[in-house]
Amino acid sequence: MFDTVCTLPLSADLFAQAIHPKEPIVSVGLASGHVETFRLPSDEVDSDDDQASTSSSRNGRGHIDTMWRTRRHKGSCRCLTFGIDGESLYSAGTDGLVKAAKAETGVVENKIAIPPEKDGSVDAPTVIHALSPQTLLLATDSSALHLYDLRLPFSRVSARPQQSHHPHDDYISSITPLPASDTSTSGFSKQWVSTGGTTLAVTDLRRGVMVRSEDQEEELISSVYVGGLATTGTSRGEKVIVGGSSGVLTLWEKGAWDDQDERIYVQRSGGEGESLETLAMVPDELGRGKMVAVGLGSGGVKFVRIGPNKVVSEVTHDETEGVVGLGFDVEGRMVSGGGQVVKVWHEAVGSGANGASAGEKHMLGDSDEDSDDDDNDDSDDSDGERRRADEAKRKRKKGKGKDRSGGQHVMAFYDLD
């Protein structure tokens, strides 16, 4: 299905990655505090003049443009998310600030101060998610989950969260919104699933924490929602898939949150499982059914078909650095990030008998030029800040990133034809 990989080198370790909901745009947050936004080549043909560039894009030779780059945070940028409409990009850093910027230009429009720890130290962010045009969710190292009203302009008073919860005993590792109910008037989600430590929890926008699962006796790291499954017996055809630290995916039936429903063994190595760091649903038209892409701590990406519940294919993002970011853009291309590299995997144009075709890998080294347009309150890098950035890495630390440009990578889904 995918055969060509474009490799985009970064200037520092990748901590966060966000994909625009409506345009072929990817943003990254780095250990150095920088935030960079790139526009990927489009496969759409608007005129005859675009035919040549479109052909190049499909073969992996399109040009990736740097839209903007700035040192957004003093310390590391821990997490990123686009707003529902894609107009804003929210970043959170170990400087204790959330900044809302125009996605197109990077100009900061609003700031939010993260509530500090009881001793006054920074409570570093772990996950950020725009639930609706009005509500922003922010999780932190202390296990706090803050809800902010985005309609309020910035001030020292309005910067305080409207609600705060503690759905877990440990830091929150993932947030997955549940679809709005059929009776919803806004169409936006009002409930979400979170993972933290060894538990899963469901929180409601109005009612707070509704339920917390039993202790799963392993760390729960990542999560994603999947709907449209077969409805059998008590199953509604909706599940949340959770990735754990032991290489196992667990499936949770919506509405039955006490304990997991099914288990899928994804990665085992030497008797120990590899952590499943990030999950993304493969678009139905590409996966030919329900399929989840799983980013591993070992640097691979595995593809698991839901239903048969088995691994059908895998690719390698990096041989040593774990996959931190994973998702699909509006044109169906997979974007994986980890270490000091982001890779864009294109859909194969002429797949062979096994679903693969020969492809080339291209280094787009001119995309990482510095054009810093820092905020007024940002400062230059210093050794001390870099040390703090290193210390602020997630608890499942994966070592220092390296700029690699290995051999050809081809993705083949052998059982799909």
UniProtKB/Swiss-Prot annotation:
SUPFAM superfamilies: WD40 repeat-like. Residues 41-64, 352-417 are annotated as: Disordered. It is found in: Nucleus, Nucleolus. It comes from Aspergillus oryzae (strain ATCC 42149 / RIB 40) (Yellow koji mold). The keyword Nucleus applies. GO terms for cellular component: nucleolus. WD repeats lie at residues 72-111, 117-158, 221-262, 318-355. Keywords: Nucleus, Repeat, WD repeat. Residues 366-383 have a biased composition (Acidic residues). It comes from the Eukaryota. InterPro entries: WD40/YVTN_repeat-like_dom_sf, WD40_repeat_dom_sf, WDR55_POC1. Belongs to the WD repeat WDR55 family. This is WD repeat-containing protein jip5. Residues 384-393 have a biased composition (Basic and acidic residues). PANTHER family: WD REPEAT-CONTAINING PROTEIN 55.
